[in-house]
Amino acid sequence: MHVFNFLLFYPIFMSIYWIVGSIYYFFIKEKPFNRSLLVKSEHQQVEGISFLLACYNESETVQDTLSSVLSLEYPEKEIIIINDGSSDNTAEIIYDFKKNHDFKFVDLEVNRGKANALNEGIKQASYEYVMCLDADTVIDDDAPFYMIEDFKKNPKLGAVTGNPRIRNKSSILGKIQTIEYASIIGCIKRSQSLAGAINTISGVFTLFKKSALKDVGYWDTDMITEDIAVSWKLHLFDYEIKYEPRALCWMLVPETIGGLWKQRVRWAQGGHEVLLRDFWPTIKTKKLSLYILMFEQIASITWVYIVLCYLSFLVITANILDYTYLKYSFSIFFFSSFTMTFINIIQFTVALFIDSRYEKKNIVGLIFLSWYPTLYWVINAAVVIMAFPKALKRKKGGYATWSSPDRGNIQR
Protein backbone atom coordinates (compact mmCIF):
# COMPACT_ATOMS: atom_id res chain seq x y z
CA MET A 1 0.00 0.00 0.00
CA HIS A 2 2.92 2.35 0.74
CA VAL A 3 4.27 1.73 -2.76
CA PHE A 4 0.86 2.48 -4.26
CA ASN A 5 0.68 5.73 -2.28
CA PHE A 6 4.08 6.73 -3.68
CA LEU A 7 2.92 5.99 -7.22
CA LEU A 8 -0.21 8.05 -6.76
CA PHE A 9 1.01 10.99 -4.72
CA TYR A 10 4.55 11.64 -5.96
CA PRO A 11 3.46 13.45 -9.18
CA ILE A 12 0.79 15.31 -7.22
CA PHE A 13 3.30 16.35 -4.54
CA MET A 14 5.83 17.56 -7.13
CA SER A 15 3.18 19.57 -8.99
CA ILE A 16 2.07 21.25 -5.76
CA TYR A 17 5.72 21.92 -4.87
CA TRP A 18 6.28 23.58 -8.25
CA ILE A 19 3.10 25.66 -7.91
CA VAL A 20 3.90 26.92 -4.41
CA GLY A 21 7.56 27.51 -5.26
CA SER A 22 6.69 29.46 -8.40
CA ILE A 23 4.18 31.70 -6.62
CA TYR A 24 6.59 32.44 -3.78
CA TYR A 25 9.50 33.08 -6.15
CA PHE A 26 7.40 35.36 -8.33
CA PHE A 27 6.08 37.61 -5.58
CA ILE A 28 9.22 37.71 -3.42
CA LYS A 29 12.09 37.64 -5.91
CA GLU A 30 10.69 38.28 -9.38
CA LYS A 31 7.84 40.78 -9.26
CA PRO A 32 9.76 43.52 -7.39
CA PHE A 33 12.08 43.86 -10.39
CA ASN A 34 10.11 45.46 -13.19
CA ARG A 35 11.64 44.43 -16.51
CA SER A 36 10.53 47.70 -18.09
CA LEU A 37 12.75 49.76 -15.76
CA LEU A 38 16.15 48.79 -17.14
CA VAL A 39 18.15 52.01 -17.35
CA LYS A 40 20.94 51.35 -19.80
CA SER A 41 22.66 54.64 -19.01
CA GLU A 42 23.76 53.02 -15.75
CA HIS A 43 25.69 50.45 -17.76
CA GLN A 44 28.02 52.69 -19.72
CA GLN A 45 31.04 50.95 -18.14
CA VAL A 46 29.83 47.46 -18.91
CA GLU A 47 31.83 44.28 -18.68
CA GLY A 48 32.76 42.78 -22.02
CA ILE A 49 30.98 39.63 -23.19
CA SER A 50 32.28 36.98 -25.58
CA PHE A 51 29.38 35.33 -27.43
CA LEU A 52 30.05 31.66 -28.29
CA LEU A 53 27.90 30.04 -30.99
CA ALA A 54 28.62 26.36 -31.56
CA CYS A 55 26.84 24.87 -34.55
CA TYR A 56 26.48 21.65 -36.51
CA ASN A 57 24.41 21.56 -39.72
CA GLU A 58 22.69 24.88 -38.98
CA SER A 59 22.64 26.33 -42.49
CA GLU A 60 19.00 27.43 -42.17
CA THR A 61 19.36 29.23 -38.83
CA VAL A 62 22.91 30.41 -38.24
CA GLN A 63 22.57 33.63 -40.22
CA ASP A 64 19.54 34.75 -38.19
CA THR A 65 21.40 34.14 -34.94
CA LEU A 66 24.52 35.96 -36.09
CA SER A 67 22.42 38.92 -37.22
CA SER A 68 20.63 38.95 -33.87
CA VAL A 69 23.86 39.07 -31.85
CA LEU A 70 25.51 41.63 -34.14
CA SER A 71 22.50 43.95 -33.79
CA LEU A 72 22.49 43.91 -29.97
CA GLU A 73 22.91 47.30 -28.29
CA TYR A 74 25.34 45.81 -25.80
CA PRO A 75 28.44 47.95 -26.41
CA GLU A 76 31.36 45.72 -25.41
CA LYS A 77 31.12 42.38 -27.16
CA GLU A 78 32.83 39.94 -29.47
CA ILE A 79 31.32 37.04 -31.40
CA ILE A 80 32.99 33.66 -31.80
CA ILE A 81 31.25 31.07 -33.94
CA ILE A 82 32.42 27.46 -34.06
CA ASN A 83 31.47 25.14 -36.90
CA ASP A 84 31.79 21.58 -35.60
CA GLY A 85 32.52 19.74 -38.82
CA SER A 86 29.11 20.34 -40.39
CA SER A 87 28.22 18.06 -43.30
CA ASP A 88 26.00 20.69 -44.95
CA ASN A 89 26.97 24.16 -46.21
CA THR A 90 27.03 25.85 -42.78
CA ALA A 91 30.73 26.73 -43.11
CA GLU A 92 30.23 28.31 -46.54
CA ILE A 93 27.36 30.45 -45.24
CA ILE A 94 29.46 31.66 -42.31
CA TYR A 95 32.49 32.45 -44.51
CA ASP A 96 30.24 34.41 -46.87
CA PHE A 97 28.61 36.28 -43.97
CA LYS A 98 32.03 37.12 -42.52
CA LYS A 99 32.94 39.14 -45.61
CA ASN A 100 30.71 41.98 -44.40
CA HIS A 101 30.71 41.45 -40.62
CA ASP A 102 33.28 41.35 -37.87
CA PHE A 103 33.46 38.15 -35.83
CA LYS A 104 35.83 35.26 -35.12
CA PHE A 105 35.29 31.95 -36.87
CA VAL A 106 36.65 28.60 -35.67
CA ASP A 107 36.11 26.00 -38.40
CA LEU A 108 36.64 22.49 -37.04
CA GLU A 109 37.05 19.72 -39.60
CA VAL A 110 35.71 16.86 -37.48
CA ASN A 111 32.40 16.67 -35.58
CA ARG A 112 33.35 16.01 -31.94
CA GLY A 113 30.29 17.39 -30.20
CA LYS A 114 29.07 20.67 -28.77
CA ALA A 115 31.21 20.48 -25.62
CA ASN A 116 34.41 20.12 -27.62
CA ALA A 117 33.33 22.96 -29.92
CA LEU A 118 32.73 25.25 -26.94
CA ASN A 119 36.08 24.29 -25.43
CA GLU A 120 37.78 25.25 -28.69
CA GLY A 121 35.80 28.47 -28.96
CA ILE A 122 36.49 29.71 -25.45
CA LYS A 123 40.22 29.67 -26.22
CA GLN A 124 39.52 32.66 -28.48
CA ALA A 125 37.48 34.56 -25.87
CA SER A 126 38.95 37.90 -24.79
CA TYR A 127 36.50 38.73 -22.01
CA GLU A 128 35.79 37.33 -18.53
CA TYR A 129 32.11 36.76 -19.32
CA VAL A 130 31.11 34.21 -21.95
CA MET A 131 27.60 33.91 -23.41
CA CYS A 132 26.83 30.48 -24.88
CA LEU A 133 24.08 30.37 -27.50
CA ASP A 134 22.58 27.74 -29.74
CA ALA A 135 22.68 28.56 -33.43
CA ASP A 136 18.88 28.90 -33.67
CA THR A 137 18.59 31.54 -30.93
CA VAL A 138 17.43 35.15 -31.23
CA ILE A 139 18.20 37.29 -28.17
CA ASP A 140 16.15 40.05 -26.60
CA ASP A 141 18.16 43.28 -26.68
CA ASP A 142 17.97 43.83 -22.91
CA ALA A 143 18.99 40.29 -21.94
CA PRO A 144 22.79 40.78 -21.65
CA PHE A 145 22.28 43.83 -19.42
CA TYR A 146 20.08 41.90 -16.97
CA MET A 147 22.47 38.98 -16.85
CA ILE A 148 25.66 40.98 -16.34
CA GLU A 149 23.86 42.97 -13.63
CA ASP A 150 23.29 39.73 -11.69
CA PHE A 151 27.01 39.01 -11.69
CA LYS A 152 27.74 42.46 -10.29
CA LYS A 153 25.32 41.85 -7.42
CA ASN A 154 26.60 38.38 -6.51
CA PRO A 155 30.31 37.50 -6.85
CA LYS A 156 29.54 33.84 -6.04
CA LEU A 157 27.73 33.37 -9.34
CA GLY A 158 29.30 31.06 -11.89
CA ALA A 159 26.46 31.27 -14.42
CA VAL A 160 23.22 33.12 -15.14
CA THR A 161 20.71 31.26 -17.27
CA GLY A 162 18.00 32.97 -19.27
CA ASN A 163 14.34 32.44 -20.08
CA PRO A 164 13.94 30.73 -23.48
CA ARG A 165 10.74 31.28 -25.45
CA ILE A 166 9.39 29.33 -28.42
CA ARG A 167 9.66 30.84 -31.91
CA ASN A 168 7.78 28.23 -33.93
CA LYS A 169 4.25 27.90 -32.55
CA SER A 170 2.28 27.14 -35.70
CA SER A 171 2.02 23.38 -35.11
CA ILE A 172 0.34 21.48 -32.27
CA LEU A 173 3.78 20.29 -31.06
CA GLY A 174 5.02 23.88 -31.04
CA LYS A 175 2.03 24.97 -28.95
CA ILE A 176 2.46 22.03 -26.57
CA GLN A 177 6.11 22.92 -25.97
CA THR A 178 5.12 26.54 -25.37
CA ILE A 179 2.90 25.26 -22.57
CA GLU A 180 5.65 22.98 -21.29
CA TYR A 181 8.25 25.73 -21.03
CA ALA A 182 5.80 27.98 -19.21
CA SER A 183 3.90 25.62 -16.91
CA ILE A 184 6.57 23.00 -16.21
CA ILE A 185 10.14 24.06 -17.02
CA GLY A 186 9.65 27.65 -15.82
CA CYS A 187 7.96 26.46 -12.63
CA ILE A 188 10.72 23.91 -11.97
CA LYS A 189 13.49 26.49 -12.35
CA ARG A 190 11.74 28.92 -10.00
CA SER A 191 11.13 26.22 -7.39
CA GLN A 192 14.68 24.90 -7.59
CA SER A 193 16.01 28.44 -7.24
CA LEU A 194 14.27 28.71 -3.88
CA ALA A 195 15.90 25.45 -2.75
CA GLY A 196 19.28 26.93 -3.64
CA ALA A 197 20.38 24.89 -6.66
CA ILE A 198 19.16 24.59 -10.26
CA ASN A 199 19.48 21.19 -11.92
CA THR A 200 20.63 22.67 -15.20
CA ILE A 201 21.27 25.89 -17.00
CA SER A 202 19.60 26.36 -20.38
CA GLY A 203 22.24 25.30 -22.88
CA VAL A 204 20.51 27.43 -25.47
CA PHE A 205 21.20 30.69 -23.59
CA THR A 206 23.52 31.14 -20.57
CA LEU A 207 26.13 33.67 -19.45
CA PHE A 208 29.17 32.17 -17.69
CA LYS A 209 32.08 33.60 -15.75
CA LYS A 210 35.13 32.32 -17.62
CA SER A 211 37.20 31.90 -14.46
CA ALA A 212 34.47 29.65 -13.02
CA LEU A 213 34.52 27.50 -16.15
CA LYS A 214 38.30 27.24 -15.87
CA ASP A 215 38.00 26.11 -12.25
CA VAL A 216 35.64 23.25 -13.15
CA GLY A 217 37.58 22.15 -16.23
CA TYR A 218 35.25 23.68 -18.83
CA TRP A 219 32.77 21.41 -20.65
CA ASP A 220 32.90 17.59 -20.57
CA THR A 221 33.32 16.16 -24.05
CA ASP A 222 32.07 12.68 -23.07
CA MET A 223 28.73 13.77 -21.57
CA ILE A 224 25.68 13.73 -23.84
CA THR A 225 24.30 16.97 -22.33
CA GLU A 226 27.11 19.40 -21.63
CA ASP A 227 24.78 21.94 -20.00
CA ILE A 228 23.58 19.61 -17.22
CA ALA A 229 27.13 18.34 -16.65
CA VAL A 230 28.67 21.80 -16.27
CA SER A 231 25.80 22.92 -14.01
CA TRP A 232 26.54 20.18 -11.48
CA LYS A 233 30.29 20.83 -11.66
CA LEU A 234 29.67 24.49 -10.83
CA HIS A 235 27.55 23.45 -7.84
CA LEU A 236 30.24 21.04 -6.63
CA PHE A 237 32.83 23.84 -6.82
CA ASP A 238 30.58 26.08 -4.66
CA TYR A 239 29.51 28.38 -7.48
CA GLU A 240 25.90 29.54 -7.64
CA ILE A 241 23.64 29.54 -10.69
CA LYS A 242 20.88 32.12 -11.09
CA TYR A 243 17.74 31.88 -13.17
CA GLU A 244 17.05 35.28 -14.75
CA PRO A 245 13.47 35.24 -16.13
CA ARG A 246 13.79 38.79 -17.48
CA ALA A 247 16.55 37.71 -19.89
CA LEU A 248 14.57 36.46 -22.89
CA CYS A 249 15.56 34.64 -26.02
CA TRP A 250 13.58 32.88 -28.74
CA MET A 251 14.49 29.43 -30.00
CA LEU A 252 13.21 26.76 -32.36
CA VAL A 253 11.83 23.47 -31.04
CA PRO A 254 11.25 20.10 -32.75
CA GLU A 255 7.99 19.83 -34.67
CA THR A 256 8.09 16.12 -35.43
CA ILE A 257 7.35 13.31 -32.98
CA GLY A 258 10.66 11.66 -33.84
CA GLY A 259 12.66 14.84 -33.31
CA LEU A 260 10.97 15.58 -30.00
CA TRP A 261 11.46 12.00 -28.78
CA LYS A 262 15.19 12.03 -29.58
CA GLN A 263 15.60 15.36 -27.80
CA ARG A 264 13.85 14.19 -24.63
CA VAL A 265 15.72 10.88 -24.49
CA ARG A 266 18.98 12.80 -24.84
CA TRP A 267 18.00 15.21 -22.04
CA ALA A 268 17.05 12.35 -19.73
CA GLN A 269 20.17 10.35 -20.58
CA GLY A 270 22.32 13.40 -19.84
CA GLY A 271 20.67 13.91 -16.46
CA HIS A 272 21.19 10.26 -15.56
CA GLU A 273 24.84 10.35 -16.66
CA VAL A 274 25.47 13.29 -14.36
CA LEU A 275 23.63 11.62 -11.48
CA LEU A 276 25.75 8.48 -11.83
CA ARG A 277 28.98 10.46 -12.12
CA ASP A 278 28.35 12.99 -9.36
CA PHE A 279 26.42 10.91 -6.81
CA TRP A 280 29.28 10.40 -4.34
CA PRO A 281 30.86 13.84 -4.83
CA THR A 282 27.43 15.32 -4.07
CA ILE A 283 27.05 13.22 -0.91
CA LYS A 284 30.44 14.47 0.31
CA THR A 285 29.46 18.14 -0.08
CA LYS A 286 26.95 17.94 2.81
CA LYS A 287 24.97 20.71 1.07
CA LEU A 288 21.22 20.50 1.64
CA SER A 289 20.40 22.24 -1.64
CA LEU A 290 22.26 19.57 -3.64
CA TYR A 291 20.75 16.79 -1.54
CA ILE A 292 17.27 18.09 -2.41
CA LEU A 293 18.18 18.30 -6.09
CA MET A 294 19.64 14.80 -6.12
CA PHE A 295 16.68 13.36 -4.21
CA GLU A 296 14.33 14.81 -6.82
CA GLN A 297 16.27 13.09 -9.62
CA ILE A 298 16.45 9.74 -7.83
CA ALA A 299 12.79 9.85 -6.78
CA SER A 300 11.71 10.53 -10.37
CA ILE A 301 13.67 7.56 -11.73
CA THR A 302 12.44 5.34 -8.90
CA TRP A 303 8.84 6.39 -9.55
CA VAL A 304 9.11 5.47 -13.23
CA TYR A 305 10.46 1.97 -12.62
CA ILE A 306 7.99 1.27 -9.82
CA VAL A 307 5.19 2.28 -12.19
CA LEU A 308 6.61 -0.11 -14.79
CA CYS A 309 6.84 -2.98 -12.29
CA TYR A 310 3.40 -2.26 -10.86
CA LEU A 311 1.72 -2.20 -14.26
CA SER A 312 3.51 -5.39 -15.26
CA PHE A 313 2.31 -7.05 -12.06
CA LEU A 314 -1.27 -5.96 -12.74
CA VAL A 315 -1.17 -7.34 -16.27
CA ILE A 316 0.25 -10.68 -15.11
CA THR A 317 -2.17 -11.12 -12.20
CA ALA A 318 -5.26 -9.46 -13.68
CA ASN A 319 -8.48 -11.41 -14.03
CA ILE A 320 -10.51 -9.74 -16.73
CA LEU A 321 -13.59 -11.61 -15.53
CA ASP A 322 -13.28 -10.25 -11.98
CA TYR A 323 -15.77 -7.39 -11.99
CA THR A 324 -14.91 -6.21 -8.46
CA TYR A 325 -11.21 -6.05 -9.27
CA LEU A 326 -11.80 -4.15 -12.50
CA LYS A 327 -14.18 -1.71 -10.82
CA TYR A 328 -11.68 -1.01 -8.03
CA SER A 329 -8.80 -0.52 -10.47
CA PHE A 330 -10.85 1.81 -12.66
CA SER A 331 -12.02 3.89 -9.68
CA ILE A 332 -8.43 4.36 -8.47
CA PHE A 333 -7.28 5.28 -11.97
CA PHE A 334 -10.16 7.73 -12.39
CA PHE A 335 -9.53 9.37 -9.01
CA SER A 336 -5.79 9.80 -9.56
CA SER A 337 -6.26 11.07 -13.12
CA PHE A 338 -8.92 13.56 -12.07
CA THR A 339 -6.83 14.83 -9.14
CA MET A 340 -3.70 15.16 -11.26
CA THR A 341 -5.54 16.96 -14.04
CA PHE A 342 -7.19 19.36 -11.58
CA ILE A 343 -3.85 20.24 -9.98
CA ASN A 344 -2.21 20.63 -13.37
CA ILE A 345 -4.91 23.06 -14.51
CA ILE A 346 -4.09 25.12 -11.41
CA GLN A 347 -0.39 24.87 -12.29
CA PHE A 348 -1.14 25.94 -15.85
CA THR A 349 -3.19 28.94 -14.65
CA VAL A 350 -0.46 30.08 -12.24
CA ALA A 351 2.21 29.68 -14.91
CA LEU A 352 0.14 31.58 -17.48
CA PHE A 353 -0.30 34.44 -15.02
CA ILE A 354 3.44 34.62 -14.31
CA ASP A 355 4.45 34.12 -17.92
CA SER A 356 2.16 36.86 -19.24
CA ARG A 357 4.65 39.32 -17.76
CA TYR A 358 7.13 38.34 -20.44
CA GLU A 359 5.07 37.19 -23.40
CA LYS A 360 1.43 37.71 -24.30
CA LYS A 361 -0.26 34.50 -25.38
CA ASN A 362 -3.44 33.55 -27.18
CA ILE A 363 -5.21 32.27 -24.06
CA VAL A 364 -8.20 30.91 -25.96
CA GLY A 365 -5.91 28.88 -28.19
CA LEU A 366 -3.84 27.54 -25.29
CA ILE A 367 -6.48 26.76 -22.66
CA PHE A 368 -7.40 23.48 -24.34
CA LEU A 369 -3.78 22.37 -23.86
CA SER A 370 -3.91 22.73 -20.06
CA TRP A 371 -4.12 18.94 -19.81
CA TYR A 372 -0.54 18.62 -21.09
CA PRO A 373 1.23 18.62 -17.69
CA THR A 374 -0.62 15.36 -16.95
CA LEU A 375 0.66 13.85 -20.19
CA TYR A 376 4.12 15.14 -19.29
CA TRP A 377 4.41 12.50 -16.58
CA VAL A 378 3.53 9.74 -19.04
CA ILE A 379 6.08 10.98 -21.57
CA ASN A 380 8.69 11.38 -18.84
CA ALA A 381 8.17 7.78 -17.73
CA ALA A 382 8.65 6.42 -21.25
CA VAL A 383 11.72 8.58 -21.79
CA VAL A 384 13.38 7.48 -18.54
CA ILE A 385 12.85 3.80 -19.38
CA MET A 386 14.73 4.36 -22.65
CA ALA A 387 17.39 6.75 -21.35
CA PHE A 388 18.61 5.20 -18.09
CA PRO A 389 20.14 2.07 -19.71
CA LYS A 390 21.93 4.36 -22.20
CA ALA A 391 23.41 6.35 -19.31
CA LEU A 392 24.69 3.16 -17.70
CA LYS A 393 26.59 2.35 -20.91
CA ARG A 394 28.27 5.78 -21.26
CA LYS A 395 31.77 5.57 -22.77
CA LYS A 396 34.11 7.68 -20.67
CA GLY A 397 36.81 9.71 -22.33
CA GLY A 398 35.27 9.81 -25.81
CA TYR A 399 33.35 12.47 -27.70
CA ALA A 400 29.58 12.83 -27.37
CA THR A 401 28.86 13.99 -30.91
CA TRP A 402 25.62 15.52 -32.11
CA SER A 403 23.38 14.88 -35.08
CA SER A 404 21.44 17.26 -37.31
CA PRO A 405 18.84 18.98 -35.12
CA ASP A 406 15.10 19.13 -35.78
CA ARG A 407 14.47 22.89 -35.79
CA GLY A 408 10.85 22.71 -36.91
CA ASN A 409 9.27 25.38 -39.07
CA ILE A 410 11.39 28.54 -38.99
CA GLN A 411 9.15 31.59 -38.64
CA ARG A 412 10.81 34.86 -39.51
Swiss-Prot record:
Parts of the chain that traverse the membrane: 7-28, 298-320, 332-354, 364-386
Record EC number: 2.4.1.-
BP terms from Gene Ontology: cell adhesion involved in biofilm formation
Main location: membrane
Membrane found in the keyword field: yes
SUPFAM superfamilies: Nucleotide-diphospho-sugar transferases
Signal sequence range: none
Uppermost EC category: transferase
Subcellular location per the Swiss-Prot or TrEMBL entry: Cell membrane
Pfam families: Glycos_transf_2
A single GO cellular-component term on record: plasma membrane
Molecular function in Gene Ontology: acetylglucosaminyltransferase activity
Description of the deletion phenotype: Complete loss of the intercellular adhesion phenotype.
Entry keyword set: Cell membrane, Glycosyltransferase, Membrane, Transferase, Transmembrane, Transmembrane helix
Topology with respect to the bilayer: Multi-pass membrane protein
Family per record: Belongs to the glycosyltransferase 2 family.
General function of this protein: N-acetylglucosaminyltransferase that catalyzes the polymerization of single monomer units of UDP-N-acetylglucosamine to produce the linear homomer poly-beta-1,6-N-acetyl-D-glucosamine (PNAG, also referred to as PIA), a biofilm adhesin polysaccharide. Requires IcaD for full activity.
Protein name as it appears in the record: Poly-beta-1,6-N-acetyl-D-glucosamine synthase
Naturally occurring in which organism (per UniProt): Staphylococcus epidermidis (strain ATCC 35984 / DSM 28319 / BCRC 17069 / CCUG 31568 / BM 3577 / RP62A)
